[in-house]
Amino acid sequence: MTDTALAAPFECPLRTVEHEWVDYNGHLNMAYYHVLFDQSLDKLFNDLGIGWDYTKQGEGSCFTAEVHVCYLDELLEGDEVRITYQVLDADAKRLHVFAHMYHAEKGYLAATSEQMCIHVDMKTRRAAPFPEASQKKIEALAKAHAGLARPEQAGRVIGIKRK
């Protein structure tokens, strides 16, 4: 990643809504929003050195501790989807990321996903610090993203507001 690319939200490869992902309402089923967010996060993890190549070495991996998805607009079969990731915060063991899912052609925001990831030592299956090289990349990305606007949906809590 170049310094210029660091300052913008991280762009993931475009994806297309597949036929098998459409439910009886005729739109992308809620579970597949998670699939798209998860598979797109793999691209960011690969660039940070904590993706599949790292995980299959058996030393460490990233687990999801919490995720919150907001469904804002429909996606239909065949729609191309663009997903971006923004680092909201990070420390030695945790990575707090926020994703925006857009209809690639029409540009509207279809969904957001806020996620807390924890780095895990696969031998002990306990939280452990990121590898040093990855930690440096995460810190650089977090610093570059610090100037981005905080997403409107970040930090939301589920509940019914009572008067």
Residue positions per predicted region:
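Hydrophobic beta-sheet segments that form the core/acyl-binding groove
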Residues: 68-104
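Hydrophobic core residues within well-ordered beta-strands of beta-rich domains
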Residues: 11, 63-65, 81, 95, ...
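Hot-dog-fold acyl-thioester-processing enzymes
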Residues: 2-64, 121-163
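Short hydrophobic alpha-helix segments
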Residues: 113-115, 131
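Generic short beta-strand
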Residues: 19, 99-101, 117
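Conserved GNAT-family N-acetyltransferase fold
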Residues: 37, 99, 113
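A structural signal for beta-strand boundary/capping segments at domain termini and interdomain linkers
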Residues: 108-109, 127
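Solvent-exposed strand-loop boundary residues in beta-sheet-rich modules
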Residues: 105-107, 123
